[in-house]
Amino acid sequence: MTLSHGELLYEGKAKRIYASADDQQVLVEFKNDATAFNAQKKAQLEHKGRLNCQISACLFELLERHGIPTHYVGVADATWMVVQRVEVIPIEVVLRNTATGSLCRETPIPQGTALDPALLDLYYKDDALGDPLLTDARIALLGVVSAELRQRMEALARQVNAVLQPFFKDLGLQLVDFKLELGLNQAGELLVADEISPDTCRLWDLSSTDANERILDKDRFRKDLGGVIEAYGEVCKRVQGACPQPRNCG
């Protein structure tokens, strides 16, 4: 189904954003595109957009039930979401509960090491630069966020982790790490934006001890493990089984 929408405002690797009749809201279309390594690796995966849209809707509503503000308004169709219009902050927040990925490549920390408290990393959102890791001094030099806003961003990200980590554990999933995009709405409120899905979270099946079989996230695509849509579908099934039906704005 193609919804009635306004002009295309932005197209990213996984979503298209369109104007809507309400100037404080936009329509987000989740695409079937799969990308990795800053879009150097690409593929089309049927049903990926639908699965990520439905998972994100459930998780945004979960966060809101715990008092965490998000840009989410509701779903308009299987692959379409209505969200508040926000100014996305060009800093990506990554929360790491378990050491893996780039952390293990860049440090001597062993794969699978539990991180308590969770490690919070900040990255500058710029594909051309490879989304570099930021230091305190570089954040101050760039001047993209004030010290006060940065503190709010970090506090909000840790609140998200405090909700998602036990939620996924109850579903038999380990929330290894995840990335967040945050934005400011027209009232200046800081909101969780973008999406929360296996594209943005590393999720391991707690019932599996096999290092590859347990992966239920985008690493299946990155590492050519196959079964990407089956893994996303399993996450969607578990999440939807634990959440009410998402709000419908269609």
Curated annotation (Swiss-Prot):
Keyword field contains DNA damage: no
Reaction(s) the record says it catalyses: 5-amino-1-(5-phospho-D-ribosyl)imidazole-4-carboxylate + L-aspartate + ATP = (2S)-2-[5-amino-1-(5-phospho-beta-D-ribosyl)imidazole-4-carboxamido]succinate + ADP + phosphate + 2 H(+)
Gene3D superfamilies, sorted: ATP-grasp fold, B domain (3.30.470.20), Phosphorylase Kinase, domain 1 (3.30.200.20)
Molecular function via GO: ATP binding; phosphoribosylaminoimidazolesuccinocarboxamide synthase activity
Pfam families: SAICAR_synt
Enzyme Commission number(s) from the entry: 6.3.2.6
Keywords for the protein's UniProt record, in alphabetical order: ATP-binding, Ligase, Nucleotide-binding, Purine biosynthesis
Family named by the database record: Belongs to the SAICAR synthetase family.
PANTHER family found in the cross-reference section: MULTIFUNCTIONAL PROTEIN ADE2 (PTHR43599), SI:DKEY-6E2.2 (PTHR43599:SF3)
NCBIfam families assigned: purC
HAMAP family according to UniProt: SAICAR_synth (MF_00137)
Protein name: Phosphoribosylaminoimidazole-succinocarboxamide synthase
